[in-house]
Amino acid sequence: MAQAVADFEALPDDASRAEFVEEPPLIGDAAWDAAIAALAVHLCRLGNFDRTPEWTRAGERYSPRIAWLTLPPESTMQAFVYQRTPIYFKARGVMLDEANLVSV
């Protein structure tokens, strides 16, 4: 995800950024389909878009159960990661430390 953010930020203009967040096909894993939509929302906020793409609000872009993308299911770090998950990921049932969205 951090690489996608870095790639987005390196794009030269708004038209290229808008193309970057066009709807991708569903991959068939509810958690990752939701994560991709949340990432698109994150990128739209970074790019100061007026609105997010309609596809990011489709029902199949929400996970039916909580998904911890960067933690084992029984990790003691869940509370910490939950606190640091951006709201547009939480809203889709995807828990991901905001640090996973930054390249170092």
Kindly give the residue locations of the regions a language model identified.
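Helix-turn-helix/homeodomain-like alpha-helical modules used for DNA recognition
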Residues: 1-41
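Charge-dense, extended regions
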Residues: 44-104
